[in-house]
Amino acid sequence: MRCLLLLLLVPVPGAKVFERCEWARLLKRNGMSNYRGISLADWVCLSQWESSYNTRATNRNTDGSTDYGIFQINSRWWCDNGQTPTSNACGISCSALLTDDVGAAIICAKHVVRDPNGIGAWVAWKRHCQGQDLSSYVAGCGV
């Protein structure tokens, strides 16, 4: 029983859920502001609608693929989850997109927007961000 109690007290790492401004500043530090003409506000909006800034977000799609991480990067095209047939255009394991170190996710997102679809590859961006006033996504963030 004592071992069980000790196991219950060991903290289990949870998802990193960024605050809006914390995420905006991190994106800026990583060269995402106006990357390929995409504003920082667009990236913050996209992340809000795709994952609510949650690094461990996953979503299963009707085609059997899965979206991973804060940018919800798809396993059919961009990463390898070992289950879905994939192009793995980012050359990474999908699990690398689920860590609190978002470096791999940012590099892969940059790769995605170099594709002809650009930021339009994200349905949530098209539905919620495209053509909108996005200033509120970076307001008060000092970016």
UniProtKB/Swiss-Prot annotation:
Enzyme Commission number, as recorded: 3.2.1.17
Record carries keyword Cell membrane: no
Domain C-type lysozyme: 16-143
Transmembrane segments: none
Catalyzed chemical reaction(s): Hydrolysis of (1->4)-beta-linkages between N-acetylmuramic acid and N-acetyl-D-glucosamine residues in a peptidoglycan and between N-acetyl-D-glucosamine residues in chitodextrins
Keyword Membrane part of the UniProt annotation: no
Signal sequence bounds: 1-15
A GO CC term assigned to this protein in UniProt: extracellular region
Keywords, in A-Z order: Antimicrobial, Bacteriolytic enzyme, Disulfide bond, Glycosidase, Hydrolase, Secreted, Signal
Class of enzymatic activity (EC top level): hydrolase
A GO biological-process term: killing of cells of another organism
Pfam families on file: Lys
Location in or out of the cell: Secreted
Quaternary structure note: Monomer.
Family per record: Belongs to the glycosyl hydrolase 22 family.
Function: Lysozymes have primarily a bacteriolytic function; those in tissues and body fluids are associated with the monocyte-macrophage system and enhance the activity of immunoagents.
General remark: Lysozyme C is capable of both hydrolysis and transglycosylation; it also shows a slight esterase activity. It acts rapidly on both peptide-substituted and unsubstituted peptidoglycan, and slowly on chitin oligosaccharides.
Stated name of the protein: Lysozyme C
Phylogenetic placement of the source organism: Eukaryota, Metazoa, Chordata, Craniata, Vertebrata
